[in-house]
């Protein structure tokens, strides 16, 4: 007995939790059945849903009663196990414990079965409702199609030809009689009435919709002396005759035949009109290609592809560029409106000269960008009035200098426009002030522009050769000749535009592609002509950047004071000593004797400190002048450039003994360290008068006397 009771007790405990789930499941099924009953289903579906809800409710109640009864029996069983005495009724109830448990299990199984059945019924009802909905939609669409067809037929009955065809018939059998046509006409007035402004539009067409609905339903209501059913039969007979279908296809066939007949004519017209647009397109492509190539190296305001009569104005010297990329010859030459009075030396084919000049400009867009930190300090400072000018020239001839434009390198051009540089009748041998770093490593060919041998025409164009003299590393392996007409750009003065406080305009065209790392204002010793000629042949093994392409030499002239202002640097030489500077800016000293210093101080172009006297500016130069321990010429600061991997120069070592004392960086000399005046190692700061700045990232140069 105890074992049985314990087993039954355990069974009751194990079977206790499912009844609530079962009851909740029945409630869920009933809740699921409730929405299904709300669907617009048929009467059978609604009855089934309602019956299933009632069955599930009865089973749920029976399960709850059995659970309560089983709970009481479990309580009696526990009391009996504790030794309490029970009355006879309680003992009878405990004896029926197994029967109650079996009934509870049966009720749960029955509930699960009815729940599954209810779910199947719900799915069936939903499918039926969906099918009925689709059927209703199809019926409605069919009725709507019938209404549209009826309106079309009633509209076509107003045509006399259609009425005649319907009365005669296609095969001799009449489709409609005159009486039937009149009935349809009366019905047409009902379904498509004239607008009555006394009624609202909704009310007026509501009556028309009722007539159409009754016609579609085929009701026996009287209308127009007949019934809707009779009218529906008449309309269906017209639909079945396929009269409007055949007529519609026949009309389409005529349209297609007409279109097919007109198609060849259109094709012939298009074929005749095709050659002209093709020619126009070809001409446009040529003009566009010419504009694209020419706009790379000149300003848009100076471009004009239409003026081909100025081809004869391309009288410039022949430019030979080794290792150059060949470009296609240009079809049209741009117009050059500005006059330039230069002296032509050699005459050749204008097309060949223009091609070579453009090849030179295409390769002179160098990638170097060794800009000094001192050049980036004061970008918006105006030109210091203390910047000294070079020796003047005799203003007998004026050479107009146009604005140097290089749109591929810098977005702005800060050069002054149309500065006039007076030139003496005799050609002068002046240093070429450019930003090319190979200017300090090249050999001795001179830059000798000639201005008095012949008189160039007034409209000699040099705008196409106004590019920056910044050479690419690919060009440094061979010598190249630069035309003399392209060199006056180095005399461009920048006094009218804001410059750096250091006096160097890094935004100028020579400084846009690569920034100079040398100071152009080193003192040049007064040497005689034989020494210069001797020194010119001394470094022939080095890299030669030749700027002398003239077939004959011209005489040299002297620079006069207060006329020529340069941006990179100003040179003050002695009035009584003509100084000859090679085109590569190098003047090596004598190998046997010391370097004689000139009595004339040399200034750089950087600003002087405020408050100083005008005559004492030479003393503030930290690395120029006779008082700062400067010994030797340019060769004292020339690096060997012994096949540096980043420079691209392939120079051989020079014959003269030179000391470079740890001052080489990729083959480029960085900058002169700011020196001092006569009073100490560092003098007054230049520029805006601020404290001296450290030489950021630049190795210090130790100046040594060259023997």
Curated annotation (Swiss-Prot):
Primary localization class, coarse: cytoplasm
Any one cellular-component term (Gene Ontology): dendrite
Post-translational modification (record): Tyrosine phosphorylation by EPHA4 promotes interaction with FMR1 and liquid-liquid phase separation (LLPS) for the formation of a membraneless compartment that concentrates mRNAs with associated regulatory factors. O-glycosylated (O-GlcNAcylated), in a cell cycle-dependent manner. O-glycosylation by OGT inhibit ability to undergo liquid-liquid phase separation (LLPS).
Keywords tagged on the record: Acetylation, ATP-binding, Cell projection, Coiled coil, Cytoplasm, Differentiation, Glycoprotein, Methylation, Nucleotide-binding, Phosphoprotein, Protein synthesis inhibitor, RNA-binding
Glycosylation sites per record: 642, 647
Region (Disordered), start-end ranges: 1-48, 325-347, 412-443, 523-558, 570-620, 641-707
Protein's recorded name: Caprin-1
Domain of life: Eukaryota
Function: mRNA-binding protein that acts as a regulator of mRNAs transport, translation and/or stability, and which is involved in neurogenesis, synaptic plasticity in neurons and cell proliferation and migration in multiple cell types. Plays an essential role in cytoplasmic stress granule formation. Acts as an mRNA regulator by mediating formation of some phase-separated membraneless compartment: undergoes liquid-liquid phase separation upon binding to target mRNAs, leading to assemble mRNAs into cytoplasmic ribonucleoprotein granules that concentrate mRNAs with associated regulatory factors.
Tissue expression remark: Expressed in hippocampal and neocortical pyramidal neurons, but not in Purkinje cells.
Coiled coil: 58-92, 123-151
Low complexity compositional bias, start-end: 1-15, 22-43, 326-335, 535-558, 674-684, 695-707
Gene Ontology biological process terms from the UniProt entry: generation of neurons; intracellular mRNA localization; membraneless organelle assembly; negative regulation of translation; nervous system development; positive regulation of dendrite morphogenesis; positive regulation of dendritic spine morphogenesis; positive regulation of stress granule assembly
Location within or outside the cell: Cytoplasm, Cytoplasmic ribonucleoprotein granule; Cytoplasm, Cytosol; Cell projection, Dendrite; Cell projection, Lamellipodium
Phosphoserine modifications at: 10, 113, 333, 341
Source species of the chain: Rattus norvegicus
Domain topic, free-text comment: The C-terminal disordered region undergoes liquid-liquid phase separation (LLPS) for the formation of a membraneless compartment that concentrates mRNAs with associated regulatory factors. CAPRIN1 molecules in the condensed phase are neutral. mRNA-binding promotes phase separation. Moderate concentrations of ATP enhance phase separation by reducing the electrostatic potential of CAPRIN1, thereby promoting intermolecular interactions.
PTM-bearing positions, type Omega-N-methylarginine: 163, 624, 631, 638, 696
PANTHER family the UniProt entry points to: CAPRIN-1, GPI-ANCHORED PROTEIN P137
UniProt modified residues of type Asymmetric dimethylarginine: 696
Quaternary structure and interacting proteins, as annotated: May form homomultimers. Interacts with G3BP1; interaction is direct and promotes stress granule formation. Interacts with G3BP2; interaction is direct and promotes stress granule formation. Interacts with PQBP1. Interacts with DDX3X. Interacts (when phosphorylated by EPHA4) with FMR1; interaction with FMR1 promotes formation of a membraneless compartment.
Inhibition and activation profile: Ability to mediate liquid-liquid phase separation is regulated by ATP: moderate concentrations of ATP enhance phase separation, whereas high concentrations of ATP lead to inhibition of phase separation.
Compositional bias annotation for Polar residues: 431-443, 572-603, 641-655
């Amino acid at each position: 007995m105890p074992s049985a009771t314990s087993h039954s007790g355990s069974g009751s405990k194990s079977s206790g939790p499912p009844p609530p789930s079962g009851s909740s499941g029945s409630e869920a099924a009933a809740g699921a059945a409730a929405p299904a009953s709300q669907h617009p289903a048929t009467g059978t579906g609604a009855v089934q849903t309602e019956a299933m809800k009632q069955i599930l409710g009865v089973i749920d109640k029976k399960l709850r009663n059995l659970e309560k009864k089983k709970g009481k029996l479990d309580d009696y069983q526990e009391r009996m196990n504790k030794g309490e005495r029970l009355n006879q009724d309680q003992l009878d109830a405990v004896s029926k414990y197994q029967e109650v448990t079996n009934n509870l299990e049966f009720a749960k199984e029955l509930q699960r079965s009815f729940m599954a059945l209810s779910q199947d019924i719900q799915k069936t009802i939903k499918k039926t409702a969906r099918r009925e909905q689709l059927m209703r939609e199809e019926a409605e669409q069919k009725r709507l199609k019938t209404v549209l067809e009826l309106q079309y037929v009633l509209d076509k009955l107003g045509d006399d030809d259609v009425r005649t065809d319907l009365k005669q018939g296609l095969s001799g059998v009449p489709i409609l009689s005159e009486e039937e046509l009149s009935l349809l006409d009366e019905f047409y007035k009902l379904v498509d009435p004239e607008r009555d402004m006394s009624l609202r539009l909704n009310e007026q067409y509501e009556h028309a919709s009722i007539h159409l609905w009754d016609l579609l339903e085929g009701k026996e209501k009287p209308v127009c002396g007949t019934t809707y059913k009779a009218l529906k039969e008449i309309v269906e007979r017209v639909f079945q005759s396929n009269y409007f279908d055949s007529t519609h296809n026949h009309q389409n066939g005529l349209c297609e035949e007409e279109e097919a007949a007109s198609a060849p004519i259109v094709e012939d017209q298009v074929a005749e009109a095709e050659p002209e647009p093709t020619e126009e397109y070809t001409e446009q492509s040529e003009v566009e290609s010419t504009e694209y190539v020419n706009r790379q190296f000149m300003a848009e305001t100076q471009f004009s592809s239409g003026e081909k009569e100025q081809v004869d104005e391309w009288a410039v010297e022949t430019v030979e560029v080794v290792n150059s990329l060949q470009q296609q010859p240009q079809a049209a030459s741009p117009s050059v409106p500005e006059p330039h009075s230069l002296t032509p030396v050699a005459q050749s084919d204008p097309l060949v000269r223009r091609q070579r000049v453009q090849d030179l400009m295409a390769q002179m867009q160098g990638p170097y960008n060794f800009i000094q930190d001192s050049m980036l300090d004061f970008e918006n400072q105006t030109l210091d009035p203390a910047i000294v000018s070079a020796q003047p020239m005799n203003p007998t001839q004026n050479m107009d200098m146009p604005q140097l434009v290089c749109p591929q390198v810098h977005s702005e051009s800060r050069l002054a426009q149309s500065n006039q540089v007076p030139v003496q009748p005799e050609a002068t041998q002046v240093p070429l002030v450019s930003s090319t770093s190979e200017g300090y490593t090249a050999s001795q060919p001179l830059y000798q522009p000639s201005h008095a041998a012949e008189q160039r025409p007034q409209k000699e164009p040099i705008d196409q050769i106004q590019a920056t003299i910044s050479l690419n590393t690919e060009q440094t392996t061979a010598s190249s000749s630069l035309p003399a007409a392209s060199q006056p750009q180095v005399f461009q003065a920048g006094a009218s535009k804001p410059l750096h406080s250091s006096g160097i305009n890094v935004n100028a065209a020579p400084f846009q592609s690569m920034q100079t790392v040398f100071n152009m204002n080193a003192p040049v010793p007064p040497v005689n002509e034989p020494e210069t000629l001797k020194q010119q042949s001394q470094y022939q093994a080095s890299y030669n950047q030749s700027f002398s392409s003239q077939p004959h030499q011209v005489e040299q002239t002297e620079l006069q004071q207060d006329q020529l202002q340069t941006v990179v640097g100003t040179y003050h030489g002695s009035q009584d000593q003509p100084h000859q500077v090679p085109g590569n800016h190098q003047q090596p000293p004598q190998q046997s004797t010391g370097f004689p210093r000139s009595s004339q101080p040399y200034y750089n172009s950087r600003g002087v400190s405020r408050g100083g006297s005008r005559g004492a500016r030479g003393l503030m130069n930290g690395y120029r002048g006779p008082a700062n321990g400067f010994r030797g010429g340019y060769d004292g600061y020339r690096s060997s450039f012994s096949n540096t991997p980043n420079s691209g120069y392939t120079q051989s070592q020079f014959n003269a003994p030179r000391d470079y004392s740890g001052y080489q960086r990729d083959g480029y000399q960085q900058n002169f360290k700011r020196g001092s005046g006569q009073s100490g190692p560092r003098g007054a700061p230049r520029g805006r008068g601020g404290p001296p700045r450290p030489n950021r990232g630049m190795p210090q140069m130790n100046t040594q006397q060259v023997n």
